[in-house]
């Protein structure tokens, strides 16, 4: 079963979240469990929903968007934001906020900042195209950033990023929405749960 953004938002208002474990080291587990609870199959599709993306997060913490590695061809080929994987993924996102005790806080869509995210994406793309080695970098609007996201393999090695035969990072990187942005979404744009779901 694949849901639309609106169907997912309605279903979330009626979901019992007490059964979802608090995320520990792998914060993606909550999102996977949330998808299963909603009947959304875990898959490698670009977006979770028919018409958008589902992102769960802890209020005030950054939100992982997508791995950098698979976006490099678009970055180096100057693919416009609205046609890029990141642009498609983030253009219609349903944010699902939890507090640190795993209590459901509500949902939000926040499309009015897409232009600011696009500007940050372009800042980051310029940085990547000109950097010899990647470091944490945040766009000028302070919404989107890249930083390391990697874990060691069974041999104790990270997964370096190479482009055109050159190593540009000795670890994997990902795009994130900053904690500051996630906090702003939490405080100003959440549709609060109904009493039936509390």
List the predicted regions and their residue ranges.
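N-terminal, Lys/Arg-enriched amphipathic/low-complexity engagement segments
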Residues: 1-28, 32, 36-39, 43
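Conserved catalytic cores of phosphodiester-cleaving nucleases, focusing on short active-site segments
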Residues: 42, 50-56
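Gly/Pro- and small hydrophobic-enriched strand-loop and loop-to-helix capping segments
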Residues: 198
């Amino acid at each position: 079963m694949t849901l639309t953004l609106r169907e997912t938002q309605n279903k979330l208002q009626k979901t019992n979240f007490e059964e979802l474990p608090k995320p520990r080291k792998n914060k993606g587990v909550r999102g996977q469990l949330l998808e299963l609870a909603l009947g959304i199959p875990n898959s490698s599709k670009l977006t979770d929903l028919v018409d958008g993306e589902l992102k769960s997060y802890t209020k005030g913490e950054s939100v992982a968007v997508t791995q950098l590695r698979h976006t490099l061809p678009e970055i180096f080929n100057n693919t416009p934001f609205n046609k890029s994987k990141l642009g498609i993924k983030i253009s219609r996102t349903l944010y699902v906020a939890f507090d640190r005790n795993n209590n459901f806080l509500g949902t939000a869509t926040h499309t009015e900042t897409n232009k600011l995210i696009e500007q940050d994406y372009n800042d980051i793309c310029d940085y990547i195209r000109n950097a010899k080695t990647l470091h944490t970098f945040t766009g000028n609007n302070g919404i989107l950033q890249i930083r390391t996201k990697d874990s060691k393999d069974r041999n104790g090695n990270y997964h370096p990023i190479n482009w055109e035969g050159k190593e540009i990072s000795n670890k994997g990187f990902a795009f994130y929405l900053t904690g500051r942005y996630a906090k702003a979404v939490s405080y100003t744009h959440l549709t609060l749960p109904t009493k039936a779901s509390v």
